[in-house]
A protein has these predicted regions:
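Iron-sulfur cluster-binding electron-transfer modules in prokaryotic oxidoreductases
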Residues: 1-142
């Protein structure tokens, strides 16, 4: 069971109470981690957590089963860049930026690092934050 599924269960059972307010009306896009989504077919649980924050989900064109890897699953996090036009995490970050989010959420620590680096590369770190979805919920627990 992934932590987003556990959090969804706890909220549904009333064992975890979330206060709204902090993220009310914020535009949040969710980056699907490769192993969570494509390998384990978990797409809905993370998205079903956002209504408890009263946030607005804005989907990237490539999401769920069609989502692009941020590069961490391909070990880009641990090696030097290869020749090419663009880093894969920057390309994925650009896809996220197209939907004008306030926040990019994910559910993988490696994706979090890659997307954070992409936001920094695009010099948007003062406008857009990257969080694990559990962090967003934690900030709003009663």
């Amino acid at each position: 069971m992934h932590h987003t599924e556990l959090l969804k269960t706890l909220i549904d059972e009333g064992r975890l109470t979330i206060e709204s307010g902090t993220y009310k009306g914020k535009r949040i896009t969710f980056h699907d981690p490769c192993y969570l989504g494509r390998a384990n077919k978990v797409y809905n649980a993370p998205r079903e957590l956002l209504p408890s924050l009263e946030a607005d989900l804005v989907e990237m064109k490539k999401c769920k089963a069609r989502a692009m890897c941020c590069g961490a699953g391909g070990a880009q996090l641990f090696k030097e860049s290869e020749k090419g036009d663009k880093e894969i995490n920057v390309l994925r970050t650009e896809q996220a930026l197209e939907v004008r989010p306030d926040i990019i959420a994910t559910a993988c620590p490696f994706c979090n690092t890659m997307m954070t680096d992409g936001v920094k590369t695009k010099e948007k770190e003062t406008q857009i934050k990257v969080y694990d979805i559990a962090e967003l919920l934690y900030e709003n627990t009663k």
